[in-house]
Design a protein with these regions (language model features):
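C-terminal amphipathic helix plus adjacent low-complexity
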Residues: 1-5, 9, 13, 216, ...
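A nucleotide-sugar donor-handling region in carbohydrate enzymes
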Residues: 2-16, 151-157, 167-252, 383, ...
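Nucleotide-activated donor-dependent transferases that construct or modify glycoconjugates
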Residues: 6-43, 241
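Active-site and donor-binding regions of nucleotide-sugar-utilizing enzymes
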Residues: 26-212
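Conserved catalytic-core segment of nucleotide-activated headgroup transferases in glycan assembly
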Residues: 43-53, 207-293, 368
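Donor nucleotide-activated moiety binding/catalytic core segment of transferases
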Residues: 95-98, 109-123, 279, 284-329
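A donor-sugar binding/catalytic signature common to diverse glycosyltransferases
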Residues: 124-148, 307-352
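Catalytic binding pocket for nucleotide-activated donors in carbohydrate/polymer assembly enzymes
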Residues: 292-297, 326-399
Length: 419
């Protein structure tokens, strides 16, 4: 199998080098998690590639380009075409199956894979949301730009075995540039993924430009109130990361907040007192079989929808509860309170680890280790208690070099200067 894969890679490289590059052709690959999160060219605000693409589409100069976009739901192509036509009927945009850079990880027809590959061969620039791709077959006239999807929090360097070193070498040869939110972030990600530090550009994440409240917020709020069954006026979003070490054994089912034995009705009463809702956005890779399913009023599980995504919720949220997810660093830009739910921190530190130690120094908010502390922190947040504003500002300046909403523009000024 390894020999066949090697032969295939050589053939791919030869073919790519034989196909001339069109300087006006661009290739976009959204994050693979868009498949489960239902993010796409219409519901785009939570993915860096999709935000950049929409920024381009809404410029008059979009007609200058030939645009190729990988998609994860082919049944929505007609909706995508209608969406593009509504923006500008003269835009040339082709939708492709998601496969380039991951030929051995996608179940697509050979015909679709071949067509997507030849479209890639023509592209002068390719924008991805993650570095888990092999573009070592690219030619020098092509630029591969990783727009990024995280700011370091968890330890990603030690999460793989020795074969991960080979992956880092491949990654270094695959990408020409990688976008980060700060110099500190760039240095750590460089170590994690193998892309050399000199290839990083600190420009900020496009999705963070949209953390300001948007016109559709009232529509989303009405949907939340309808689902909750009462008029919700305050919102807390819970964004836990996944635990790859969790398995189901008899009696170990935990609540969705992490605790095995806790009275969620107690939290429910507090939420209802303040007309608040706790909206749980689970990680796409979370093992849901370890979670108890019954939830009282006021505690809602975000169900993936093509209408809106996580960053739409964050844009009007009154606060966040999180654990070890890097979404926290993005949320710092709106300067709202954060609660850190560290119910399993010692196990997580042992199994996965962190990018920084002591991690608590970077946590600008209440840190809780048990359910009663979580209850108190939520009550304080809803009552308007906020003693961590200055700490948030310091950490945000450390992890977000730019505190504005111009990241997408900065990226376009460098890589798409025809706009």
């Amino acid at each position: 199998m390894k020999i066949l894969k090697k032969i295939f890679q050589v053939i791919v490289k030869i073919i790519n080098h034989c196909v001339p590059v069109d300087s006006r052709s661009l290739y976009f690959i959204p994050h693979p998690n868009c498949r489960t999160d239902k993010y796409d060219i219409i519901n785009y605000s939570s993915d860096n590639v999709l935000v950049l693409l929409n920024y381009l589409l809404k410029k008059d100069s979009a007609e200058y380009y030939k645009i190729y976009v990988e998609i994860y739901d082919s049944s929505r192509i007609s909706e995508y075409q209608e969406y593009i036509y509504g923006i500008n009927p003269n835009i040339r945009c082709t939708f492709l199956c998601a496969c380039v850079g991951r030929f051995f990880f996608n179940k697509v027809s050979f015909k679709d894979m071949l067509y997507a590959f030849f479209c890639f061969c023509r592209a002068s620039k390719c924008f991805t949301a993650t570095f888990y791709y092999d573009f070592s077959f690219k030619k020098r006239s092509q630029q591969i730009i990783c727009l990024g999807y995280y700011t370091p929090f968890k330890d990603d360097y030690h999460m793989g075995d020795h074969s991960y070193d080979k992956f880092r070498n491949t990654t270094c040869n695959s990408f020409d540039y990688s976008i980060a939110t700060s110099c500190l972030s760039a240095r750590i990600i460089s170590i994690d993924c193998g892309i050399s530090y000199d290839k990083f550009k600190v420009l900020g994440f496009p999705r963070n430009d949209l953390l300001i409240p948007k016109n559709n917020c009232n529509v989303i709020k009405r949907e939340i109130s309808k689902f909750a069954g009462y008029d919700v006026t305050k919102y807390i979003v819970y964004t836990p990361t996944f635990r790859d070490y969790e398995t189901v054994t008899e009696g170990n089912l935990r609540s969705i907040l992490g605790y095995v034995d806790c009275d969620l009705l107690k939290l429910s009463k507090i939420l209802l007192k303040f007309n608040a809702a706790l909206i749980l956005k689970l990680h796409p890779l979370q093992n849901k079989t370890v979670l108890k399913k019954d939830l009282p009023k006021g505690i809602l599980v975000f169900e993936q929808t093509y209408k809106y995504g996580l960053y739409d919720l964050l844009s009007f949220s009154d606060g966040m509860i999180t654990d070890y997810t890097s979404t926290y660093f993005d949320f710092l830009l709106v300067n709202k309170p954060v609660i850190f739910n560290f119910y399993d921190i010692e196990e997580y530190r042992r199994v996965r680890g962190f990018s920084f130690e002591p991690i608590e120094f970077f946590c600008a908010g209440d840190i809780v280790y048990n359910y009663n502390e979580l209850i108190d922190a939520v009550m304080g947040l809803l009552a308007g208690k906020d003693i961590h504003a200055e700490h948030r500002r310091h950490i945000s300046l450390l992890m977000n070099q730019f505190q504005d909403d111009n990241s997408t523009k900065r990226i376009c000024d460098i890589f798409l200067n025809e706009i």
